[in-house]
Amino acid sequence: MALLSPYSKVPELNTATVLLVENEEELQNKLANAIVQHEKDFNVNVRLAKKLPLPVENKEARPRIDLIVFIVSLLSERSLQSAESSLSHLHSDCFLGKVCFLVTDARCGSHTQERLVSVRKLAASHHCPVICAEHRTADGVSAAALRLLNILQVSAGMTPMSTTALYLSTLTRCSLTSDLQEDYLQ
């Protein structure tokens, strides 16, 4: 089983591909539709997966994936576990501005706060950004889609040379606060 690598295929002209990975598919379809419907200056392919690794079938026909988004529902432990297990199927080059975590239900109770801390630690250990999204309203889904499109544009190399994926990574990385660092080091 090969690792998913961001540079194994040649990019298509004026086209970017985002892979949305969500175990429960609660937000995945809404977000995919919002991304496709947003007005943009480039073509966007949206691919959906429940988990990684991707199936070997149609590997040659699959486009280059410019951004991988792990959608984690904080109400579900299984959602977090699926994202954690999927990370092992990514090549290390993916973690330079090509992966992010999108979390939902961050305001729902104490269990979600514990899982949010776990996601933030996971993201910080891989130098990936964490985006919180409201998936219960159309405006929340639209705002999340717009943020992902901005990140996708940079990760696909469709912005001026001064803004690279590495630069984006330094701007959006999940930094640990001092109390999280203490927990992380223990």
From Swiss-Prot:
It is found in: Nucleus; Chromosome, Centromere. The keyword Manganese does not apply. Pfam families: CENP-M. InterPro entries: Centromere_Cenp-M (IPR020987), P-loop_NTPase (IPR027417). It comes from the Eukaryota. Its main location: nucleus. Keywords: Centromere, Chromosome, Nucleus. The keyword Transferase does not apply. One of its GO terms (cellular component) is chromosome, centromeric region. PANTHER family: CENTROMERE PROTEIN M. Probable component of a centromeric complex involved in assembly of kinetochore proteins, mitotic progression and chromosome segregation. This is Centromere protein M. The lineage of its organism: Eukaryota, Metazoa, Chordata, Craniata, Vertebrata.
